[in-house]
Structure formats: C-alpha cells, structure tokens
Amino acid sequence: MGKTLFDKLWNRHVIYGKEGEPQLLYVDLHLIHEVTSPQAFEGLRMENRPLRRPDKTFATMDHNVPTEDIFNIQDLVAKKQIEALQTNCEEFGVTLADMGSDRQGIVHMVGPETGLTQPGKVIVCGDSHTATHGAFGAIGFGIGSSEVEHVFATQTIWQQKPKSMGIEINGNLPKGVYAKDIILHLIATYGVAFGTGYAVEYYGETIRNMSMEERMTICNMAIEGGAKMGMMAPDETTFEYVRGREYAPADMDKAISDWKTLQTDPDAEYDLHIKMDASILEPYVTWGTNPEMGVPFSKAFPEIKDMNYERAYEYMGLKPGQTAEEIELGYVFIGSCTNARLSDLEEAARIVKGNKVKNNIRALVVPGSRQVRNAAESIGLDKIFIEAGFEWREPGCSMCLGMNPDQVPDGVHCASTSNRNFEGRQGKGARTHLVSPAMAAAAAINGHFIDIRKEAVISGGN
C-alpha cells in the first residue's frame, strides 16, 4: 500500500520507537519567541547544558511587542521577557530577529519569509499555530515550554504518531469568498474537535490553485479544528516561493528533486477522508466564543442547543435568530499570523481605497512582519489605509491576543482576521468575530458587517 504525505514526512524523521508507541523525532527547525522560551533557556542554564543545534534555532519577538511604538514597552513582564530573549540568544548563539530588525515579525511569518520553512522538514515552536508551516509540505506543530527545553538540549522530540485525515477541496471559490472562509466553514461544519488525534492533509483542485499565503491561512487554523498538524503537498507554487530566499537551499534543483517525492501516493489510504465543494461557500462570520460557532453570512445565528451556546450568547450579547449585519461593531483588526500577509493587506486595501472608516469604528492594520510592512509601504498600501482612517502599525501579534497594549475594550465587538474568538482573547470582555480581511475591511467602512459579494453595498464616509 502507498504512503500518505504525512507518512513519508514522519518516517523520514523517526530516530527511535516502536509503531503504536511514542517515537523520537528529529527536529529540523526550532522557532522560538519571547513568551515560551525563557523557562527553557533557564533549564539549560541550571543543568549546565549547551543548546545542541543553535544553527537550527531561530528567534524573533512578536507576542509582547507594542505595535504603536515597538521600543516603548511599558509592561514590566513583557519588557523582561523581551530582554531575556535578547540575553539568551546572545549567550547560546541563537540567531535573533530583534526589535527593529528587517526580519522581525510574527514567528509563523518570519519562518516562511526567510526561507527557513521548507518542504520535508519537522518544524516546532512554542506556539499553537505552528501548523502554518505545513503549507509547505512540512510537519509543523506547537509544543510546551518543557518540550522547548527538550528540543534545545537534544534537537529531538517524543511524539505519538497521529492518525491521518485527508480533506479534499475542489471547486472555484466564489467572488468574495477566501481561504479564511474555507477553514471557518470546515470548523463550523465538523466542530473544534473533529481533527483531534489526526494529522490533516488538505488537497484538491482548490488547494492547487491557491497562493502560498492562502495555503498558510488554512494550515494556520488546523489546530482550531482539533488537529495538531495540517499540511499540503509541495508543488511548483511552493518551490517558487522558497527560491531565492535568504535560507533557501544552495542547490535548489537538488532540493526540488527531493521535494517532488513528497506527495501522497495514488494507492495510499487515509484513516478518515472528507470531501468539500468550495464553489458553494459564502463569507463566514463567527458569532460565539470558539471558531465552531460560525455561520455563512446569509444565515441567522442558530438556536441554543446546549449550555455552551447559552453561555456564548450571554458573553457575546447576542441572541439566536440575529444576523451578522445586526452586530454593533466597535473595532476592526486586520492582522495576526492567519491574515497579515501582503496579499491580505492588498485585498483589504482594494476595498478600503477611496472610503472612510465609520465614526463608530476604531480600525487597526498590523502587518505581520517587517518585510510585509516594507513591501506594503513600497506600493502605497499604508497611505490607502491611513487616508481611510485606519491606524497603520508596527509588526507583531497585536490584537490577536491580550498580551500587549492592543486590546479590545470590555463588551465591544471586534471584526478580526485572527484565529481565535475565545472569551477574553482580545482583552477582558472583548467580543471577537472571526472573518476574512475583505470582510473586516468592508465592516470598517460601513460600520457593520456587509455581504461583500455585493459591491454596491460598500459605501464610504462618516
């Protein structure tokens, strides 16, 4: 029987262990940031251990970075964590994309941009959304601080092999529907736990037609459907994205020859298989307190089916039967490792251009990396957003999570391009609605959610 992409990647990296039991995997790339690494570095220090492969470790600042002025860090804990990463990287010989560096940004954007993320690798990071890197034909998954220390010391990690799931996606995306809507649809349809215990491969006509940035959006949110890993087979789109980047292989032809073997064999079988027609999708909006609680724009919010729904409606200040258009928005956030890439900002700017943010909205655009910010400014996107009334910020995780000054006030609804809408995720009492960048941009200039498939409803002015 043939092998799936996941089987091939996994088997390449097993150092020790029997089938059915936890196995020791070799780690090709360890990405770190300021929040989950300090304890791990201290553990090495206490045991007088070296960091085994500093050349396979790369650090950046993202979670705690204040995006209004990256050097004006008021929070003492954040300042201490950032300073600790600077000290630790210098002591242990780790390459650091420091504050103000041309490579600084959200860790899951910096890896691909620099060419560190490549097909065939096992990539780990002390962050839930490491599955983003699976878009390149790699295994990427998040780990805890104790596991970060283990990788520091050994360049390996113990893992139980998950089962395999294949999600086949075919059909052309309708106008106004994006990669973000695909993953929100999957989670709303099958639930936040459907991928638990699985490594998911997304494939099919729709995936093949996507850019790498779109593919990363889908893999980024694999964890929100319960899967530890999400991945896609590499192809010419992948190879051309990696080619010429700072850490791309010196012999690209040789690398590509190997990467082309990273495909699921025709006779391979997944443990679970799902088929999806992308051509019938609508823009999605979440109404509740996890990504499963979402609806197509044309649908009303569902009836209460259990205590979780009851609690979600209470927290969000909404009721069954309402529609997304009725939500009284106060904030719009375009950013995060899900949707802060150049193509995301270009699509948002296309909608924003010539319009103004409504008076009831505070709108932020936060490029996910310095590279994206520089590229956006080189083509004038910053001017489009600023003229429309958006705040144009420095790169960082920003309003995706309440660990820096960018937070949504208590009780306020926010249209957000991020990946999680948990209670308090964007600040105490914040009410988060997950959407695509286009939906967020249109909401900012209309003051509420609209059906972006109908261009006539995109208005401007205050």
Curated annotation (Swiss-Prot):
Alphabetical GO biological process terms: L-leucine biosynthetic process
Alphabetical list of SUPFAM superfamilies matching this protein: Aconitase iron-sulfur domain
Cofactor comment text: Binds 1 [4Fe-4S] cluster per subunit.
Molecular function terms from GO: 3-isopropylmalate dehydratase activity; 4 iron, 4 sulfur cluster binding; metal ion binding
Pathway given in the UniProt record: Amino-acid biosynthesis; L-leucine biosynthesis; L-leucine from 3-methyl-2-oxobutanoate: step 2/4
Free-text function comment from the UniProt entry: Catalyzes the isomerization between 2-isopropylmalate and 3-isopropylmalate, via the formation of 2-isopropylmaleate.
SUBUNIT field: Heterodimer of LeuC and LeuD.
Entry protein name: 3-isopropylmalate dehydratase large subunit
